[in-house]
A protein has these predicted regions:
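Domain-level signal for soluble alpha/beta catalytic cores
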Residues: 1-179, 185-301
């Protein structure tokens, strides 16, 4: 059994096979959010702050922080965003960038043990990211593609994941600090994408004994009622053994699916999390919770 321990300055979160699923809030990401990108580029992090607080209140146990803004000082923005987020919430963070300098900028100011997002099987990426993971004592997301791109063959993706785990070991990084992303593809374009991910998660768990992560909303791209489909997918992924995912926790359907799957899989001891989230609500409170969620989404749009 593999456990990945991540931390902020004051709180630990553990990814593990028999532990509650870890939802990672996705909203601190300027991609596709023009106003957020403009504000972050100009040094206004008020929306970052409100997004951070709202996601944790909604049930996110970690937050992903991305500062990818074209023609901007991404390392500088990343460092400021990490410091700001850590000042307003106490959950561990996932530092997310395709630029190595931005990853190191975030790591250099981070308090705790971060999850670095990400490394691939590409040689250049392996040799630039893994030394950072070791230097700062972080964990890392391993994405199952390499120099040849994303394979539709899950056996190829498995071998890429194995390669990354082995190369991490060469750098003194244990398999417990490698969290594999099996790559969720849009099911509207690739009909077998969901089944492939489930099969690959089971194999990663049984053979490599690593924790797993994904961008859950990728599965529903281009389809109607995306939240309903995302919730169905995440429930099945948890049943297959996935231990974390980057999601939008402001969508109540997603959080209900996650909490429910944890109960059904026996990973919510005595149903404590489910009871805390729902039983104590008085009549009508569930509707009010949904309305608050809608207001939070509108406020942070």
């Amino acid at each position: 059994m593999s456990e990945t321990v991540l931390s902020s300055a004051t709180r630990e979160v553990t990814l593990g096979f028999d532990r509650s699923f870890v939802p990672i809030g996705e909203r601190i990401n300027p991609t596709g959010r023009k106003l957020l990108a403009k504000e972050m580029k100009e040094g206004d992090f008020s929306r970052v702050e409100s997004d951070a607080v709202a996601q944790v209140e909604a049930g996110a146990r970690m937050l992903d922080v991305n500062a990818g803004i074209p023609l901007a000082d991404e390392p500088g923005i990343m460092a400021k965003a990490i410091q700001l987020v850590q000042s307003v919430v106490d959950v561990p963070l996932c530092i997310d960038s395709s630029i190595v300098a931005a990853l190191e900028a975030g790591l250099s100011v981070y308090k705790g043990k971060a999850l670095l997002n990400s490394v691939t099987g590409e040689e250049e990426r392996l040799e630039s990211v893994l030394p950072l993971v070791k230097k700062y004592g972080a964990a890392v997301v391993a994405i199952s593609n390499d120099d040849t791109g994303i394979s539709q063959d899950i056996n190829v993706r498995f071998e890429v994941a194995r390669k990354i785990v082995e190369r991490a070991a060469d750098h003194g990084i244990p398999a417990s600090d490698v969290v594999v992303d099996p790559l969720v593809m849009p099911i509207g374009a690739i009909g077998a994408a969901g089944r492939q991910v489930m099969d690959l998660v089971r194999r990663l768990r049984s053979e490599l004994k690593v924790n797993t992560i994904c961008g859950a909303s990728n599965v529903s791209f281009g389809l109607p009622n995306r939240n309903g489909l995302n919730g169905a997918f995440i429930s099945m992924a948890i049943a297959a053994g996935m231990t974390s995912a980057i999601v939008n926790p402001l969508h109540t359907e997603i959080m209900t699916a996650i909490r429910g799957a944890d109960v059904i899989m026996g990973n919510d001891k005595e149903c404590a999390n489910w009871i805390r989230a729902y039983r104590e609500l008085p009549a009508g409170a569930e509707d009010r919770r949904a309305r608050r969620g809608r207001r939070r989404r509108q406020a942070t749009a």
